[in-house]
Amino acid sequence: MVLLGDIHGDFQEIYYFSKRNETQEPINLIQVGDFGAGFRSSFIDDMEYLNTELAYNNVTLYAIRGNHDDPKFFNGDYNWSNIKLLPDYTVLEIEGKRILLVGGAISIDRLQRTENVS
């Protein structure tokens, strides 16, 4: 299990990490907020591509909303085989553990952010 946070839409880091899974043992990534959901108009396409790569490399990504994520992507409607965008207050049962994932607050600077920049 690997925890990461605050990637703010830099999905290439996850892609490169998954490519390094040479053993093909299952790896679970837990993104603990500020994933970057909804800031780029290409977000859905980015997830489709990333999901294909994660599946190929036997990596599953679980993401909880941060204050710099669009909450609408974490309502349970947006999930892929290897990417799970989890609702606030999810109890994730993984690798024999139960983890409470709370989710972030509403970002006070969301309207000032610029697509593909911040």
Where are these regions (language model features)?
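Conserved P-loop NTPase mechanochemical-coupling segment
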Residues: 1
